[in-house]
Design a protein with these regions (language model features):
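Active-site microenvironment of metallo-dependent hydrolases
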Residues: 1-26, 30-38, 86-95, 186-202, ...
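An anion/phosphate-binding loop that grips the pyrophosphate of nucleotide cofactors and donors
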Residues: 60, 360, 467
C-alpha cells in the first residue's frame, strides 16, 4: 500500500480532475482525492513535495523490434559529415570483431556537410563488412558492395533497387530490410528489446502500440514479441504487419496492420508519398500508391469481418483518401458500432478527409516530432510541397472535428520523447493548428488507451486502473507553452513499482515475469 500526498495529480480523465492524494495497492490505483480517508490514516504516507504527477505516457506508433535492433548497432543521425559517419561505424565494428554484417540507421542529406545521401562508393570507402544504412525516415536504405553481393536476385531485379547508387526504395527496401533483419540472432534481439524497453521507461512511457512483422522466417519476430512483451515493464499492443488475415486469427491476435505490407504510400523524404497534386519541385511526380483501391478494400473487408482492429500507413492526401475509402467499404460491408480502426500518420488531411474520418470513427495516430525534425527540416518540406507544407498534421482541425488523436514516435524514425512531443503539439509551426496543453497531454495518455480499447486499465489516474504514472518537476498545464520541453522527469512508476534503470532483469527473472503474466492473461 502506498499513500501519496501533497502532489499535484493531473488525472487526464474526461472530467479533467486534479487532486492532491492518490493511494495505490500493489499495481492498482484504489483512491484519489484531496484528503486521506480514515481507513488509510495509519498507513505510511509519501510526501510528493508538490510535484506534478500524470499518467504514464503512451507511444501509439513505433516499430519496437526495429527500434531495439538499431539500438544495438549504430545510429548515425548525429554525424555531421561522411567522415564522422565512417568513424562511428568503424568504432562499432572494432568493438564487435565477430560481427558478420552491420545494419545502421539514420542517414539524412539535411544534417551532413555533403548535403547529399551516401552511396555505395561512400560506404565501400568505410568498410568491407556487409553494411546497410536505413534512411532517417525508415522508407529507404543504402547498401555497400559487400552486402549487394549477398542480395538474392529478387532484390537485384526489383525496380526499387538502384544499382548505380546502392539505394533501395519501396518494395526493394522492404525486401532488403527483411533480408538483413532475418540474419539477426534471437539473443541479440532479446537483449536489444530489454535495453529498448528501459530507454522507453526512462522517458516515462508505459503503454505502447507497436507494428511488427518484417520478414523473419516463419514470422518468428511476431511470436517473439508476443512472448517477450509479457516480461517487459510496459503494456504492449502488437499490430501484425500482414495482409494475411488468417495468420493473425490463428495466433488469436486482435490487431492487424501497420507499415511495410500495410504502407499505402511512401514518405516525403523520398518524395513518394501519394499526392493528389504533383510535388512542387517535380510537378509530374505524385508519389505512388502501393495498391489499387480494390486491393485495399478487399483487405479491409476481410479484416473487419474477422473482428480485427486495422491500422494502415498513409502520409499523402491521396493515400489518406484511399485508406478512408477502404474503411468505409469495410464498415458498409460489415457494420461494427465501435471498430476503432486507425490511420497512421495522416500528414496531409484536408477538412473533407478529416470529416469523413470522424464520421467513420477513425483514430489518427500522429507523430508530432515530424513537425520539428532536423533530418527533414521545414525548408525541405516547403521546397517539395509549397503551401501544403503549412498544412502538415492539422491537429487543431482533427480534434475540433471530434477525431480521436493519439501521439507516437514512429521509432526508430524519431527518438521517443513524449514531453518533447507535447511541446511540439502546443507549439505547432502553424499556430492555427496548435493544441492546448490539456489536449496535447491526452494524446499521450487517455486517448491512446481509448483507441485500443484499453481505457478501462490505462490512460488516466482513476481508481481501478493501473498505477503507472510519471512524476514531473513542472506543471505542464500551467507553465508557458514555450517552456514545456524544459520539463524534467523526477520518477517513473509502472504497475505500482518505481522504475530504476539499473534494475535490468536477468534472463531467469525475465522468464519468471513472462510466466507470471501468461497466467494473468
Amino acid at each position: 500500500m502506498k499513500v501519496l500526498t501533497n502532489g499535484h495529480f493531473i488525472s487526464c480523465d474526461d472530467e479533467n480532475r486534479c487532486f492532491s492524494v492518490m493511494i495505490i495497492d500493489r499495481d492498482k490505483i484504489i483512491f484519489t482525492g484531496d484528503s486521506v480517508p480514515d481507513t488509510y490514516a495509519g498507513c505510511k504516507q509519501i510526501d510528493m513535495h508538490g510535484l506534478t504527477i500524470v499518467p504514464a505516457f503512451s507511444d501509439t506508433h513505433m516499430h519496437f523490434e526495429s527500434y531495439a535492433l538499431f539500438g544495438t548497432t549504430v545510429d548515425v543521425r548525429e554525424a555531421q559529415n561522411f567522415e564522422a559517419m565512417g568513424r562511428m561505424l568503424n568504432d562499432w565494428i572494432d568493438a564487435h570483431p565477430n560481427a558478420k554484417f552491420l545494419p545502421a540507421y539514420g542517414c539524412s542529406a539535411h544534417t551532413v556537410a555533403e548535403k547529399r545521401l551516401p552511396e555505395t562508393a561512400d560506404l565501400d570507402a568505410i568498410t568491407d563488412l556487409p553494411l546497410l544504412i536505413v534512411k532517417y525516415d525508415g522508407h529507404a536504405a543504402v547498401a555497400n558492395s559487400a552486402l549487394i553481393d549477398l542480395f538474392p536476385s529478387d532484390i537485384l531485379a526489383d525496380p526499387g533497387f538502384d544499382a548505380r547508387t546502392g539505394w533501395l526504395y519501396q518494395n526493394a527496401f522492404y525486401k532488403g530490410v527483411n533480408f538483413i533483419t532475418g540474419k539477426v540472432s534471437p539473443i541479440t534481439l532479446l537483449e536489444g528489446m530489454q535495453r529498448a524497453a528501459e530507454a522507453l521507461a526512462e522517458k516515462g512511457i508505459g503503454y505502447i502500440h507497436t507494428v511488427e512483422g518484417v520478414g523473419y522466417q516463419n514470422d518468428i519476430d511476431i511470436d517473439t514479441i508476443n512472448i517477450i512483451r509479457r516480461g517487459l515493464p510496459q503494456k504492449y499492443t502488437v499490430f501484425f504487419q500482414t495482409m494475411d488475415v488468417d495468420k493473425v486469427v490463428r495466433r488469436k491476435m486482435t490487431h492487424i496492420g501497420g507499415c511495410f505490407s500495410l504502407a499505402l504510400d511512401g514518405c516525403f523524404g523520398s518524395e513518394d508519398a501519394a499526392l493528389s497534386e504533383g510535388y512542387t519541385n517535380h510537378p509530374e511526380n505524385k508519389g505512388f500508391l502501393a495498391y489499387s483501391q480494390e486491393e485495399v478494400d478487399n483487405f479491409c473487408i476481410r479484416a473487419n469481418r474477422a473482428g480485427l482492429q486495422i491500422t494502415m500507413h498513409a502520409i499523402g492526401d491521396a493515400a489518406v483518401d484511399q485508406a478512408l475509402n477502404a474503411y468505409a467499404a469495410a464498415l458498409k460491408d460489415y457494420p461494427r458500432k465501435d471498430a476503432r480502426h486507425i490511420l497512421i500518420h495522416g500528414d496531409l488531411m484536408n477538412k473533407a478527409a478529416i470529416q469523413k474520418a470522424a464520421e467513420l470513427g477513425i483514430t489518427i495516430a500522429v507523430q508530432p516530432a515530424f513537425l520539428d525534425w532536423p533530418q527533414e527540416p521545414a525548408e525541405y518540406l516547403e521546397s517539395i510541397l509549397g503551401e501544403r507544407a503549412a498544412q502538415i498534421l492539422p491537429l487543431r482541425d482533427m480534434v475540433d472535428a471530434g477525431l480521436l488523436v493519439t501521439s507516437g514516435s514512429d521509432a526508430p524514425c524519431t527518438i521517443p520523447d513524449p514531453i518533447e512531443g507535447i511541446h511540439i503539439c502546443c507549439n505547432h509551426p502553424n499556430p492555427a493548428q496548435a493544441l492546448t496543453p490539456e489536449e496535447a497531454l491526452k494524446t499521450y495518455t487517455l486517448w491512446p488507451a481509448r483507441s485500443a480499447f484499453d481505457d478501462n486499465l490505462y490512460g488516466s489516474l482513476t481508481p481501478g486502473k493501473k498505477a503507472s504514472f510519471v512524476v514531473l518537476d513542472k506543471d505542464i498545464l500551467s507553465i508557458p507553452k514555450e517552456d514545456i520541453r524544459t520539463t524534467k522527469i523526477r520518477g517513473v512508476f509502472l504497475n505500482g513499482r518505481r522504475f530504476r534503470p539499473s534494475e535490468r532483469f536477468s534472463m531467469p527473472e525475465l522468464a519468471l515475469r513472462i510466466l507470471h503474466n501468461f497466467r494473468e492473461d
